[in-house]
């Protein structure tokens, strides 16, 4: 079967976990893994699995006679900002797993269909990938005046990049809650949980809704969208049924629905408690396969 050719740029934890997922894809062939450290564990694992592994960076990749159809960038925002124009000039679609946010933000279960031909798409944040689908599930049934999410992740799964970009996490996720999730106002909070043993990623979503909103329809929509996410993130699940609260004197006449989530990682390269990272690589794979379907269809 013909497959779209892909390169993973970045041979760290995210890039290596993504490699395992792409190796299982029926329509993407991860042909190259690119890094800058010749002693990288990711490059070694890629080479062991027959993937062309180079520590000579993007310059080397783009100088090859054969080039990828899709690049998955798992480096840093700074590096991606430098590389993105080069990918675009060569007609290579980019899936950005960094905070660079140069292209439209995508959550596969919500708005992938709008961006299949985009030259560059951004995956927001792990908290966004987990919670925006739930805000969307509510907002497609009734107006959401305000949505607040709390993403709690195991401290060992949060590397220096995450810790240095907490403000960016909250700003970017809040924006996605509004622009993709459909809430009029969004707020995001991240908690790094130091518990031992490390816990799975847990997310709480609160949406303010009209007092007369159809609660049965909202519940059905939440389950429907959760199933859509589970199709590409098997460890994504509701921890309980949605909980509804009636209006209170301080709620402005609005009711509230609470949604409680858990994300268990697949354990491909990262440990299962790293659901916050796994959901990013799973979403990247789903987006890449959408790109590949478009690319392969156009080449027939």
UniProtKB/Swiss-Prot annotation:
The active site is at residue 126. One of its GO terms (molecular function) is acetaldehyde dehydrogenase (acetylating) activity. InterPro entries: Acetaldehyde_dehydrogenase, Acetylaldehyde_DH_C, NAD(P)-bd_dom_sf, Semialdehyde_DH_NAD-bd. Keywords: Aromatic hydrocarbons catabolism, NAD, Oxidoreductase. Its EC number is 1.2.1.10. It holds the Pfam family AcetDehyd-dimer. NAD(+) binds at residues 11-14, 157-165, 276. Coiled coil: none annotated. One of its GO terms (biological process) is catabolic process. The keyword Heme does not apply. Belongs to the acetaldehyde dehydrogenase family. HAMAP family: Ac_ald_DH_ac. This is Acetaldehyde dehydrogenase 4. It comes from Rhodococcus jostii (strain RHA1).
């Amino acid at each position: 079967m013909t497959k779209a050719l892909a390169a993973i740029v970045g041979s760290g934890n995210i890039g290596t976990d993504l490699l395992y997922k792409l190796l299982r894809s029926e329509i993407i062939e991860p042909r190259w893994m690119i890094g800058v450290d010749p002693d990288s564990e990711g490059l070694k694992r890629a080479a062991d699995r027959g993937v062309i592994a180079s520590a000579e960076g993007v310059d080397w990749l783009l100088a090859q006679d054969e080039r990828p159809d899709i690049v998955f960038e798992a480096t840093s925002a700074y590096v991606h900002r430098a590389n993105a124009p080069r990918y675009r000039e060569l007609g290579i679609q980019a899936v950005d797993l960094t905070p660079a946010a140069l292209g439209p933000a995508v959550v596969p279960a919500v708005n992938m269909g709008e961006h299949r031909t985009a030259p560059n798409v951004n995956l927001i944040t792990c908290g966004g990938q987990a919670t925006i689908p739930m805000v969307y599930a509510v907002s497609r049934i009734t107006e959401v005046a305000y949505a607040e999410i709390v993403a709690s992740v195991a401290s060992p799964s949060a590397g220096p990049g995450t810790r240095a970009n907490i403000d960016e996490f909250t700003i970017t996720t809040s924006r996605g809650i509004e622009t993709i999730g459909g809430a009029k106002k969004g707020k995001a909070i991240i908690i790094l949980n130091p518990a031992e043993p490390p816990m799975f990623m847990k997310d709480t979503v609160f949406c303010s809704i009209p007092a007369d909103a159809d609660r049965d329809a909202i519940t059905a929509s939440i389950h429907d969208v959760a199933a859509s996410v589970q199709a590409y993130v098997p460890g994504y699940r509701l921890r309980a049924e949605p909980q509804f609260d009636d209006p209170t004197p301080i709620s402005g006449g609005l009711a509230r629905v609470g949604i409680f989530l858990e994300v268990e990682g697949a354990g491909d390269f990262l440990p299962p408690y790293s659901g916050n990272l796994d959901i990013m690589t799973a979403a990247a794979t789903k987006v890449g396969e959408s790109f590949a379907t478009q690319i392969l269809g156009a080449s027939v």
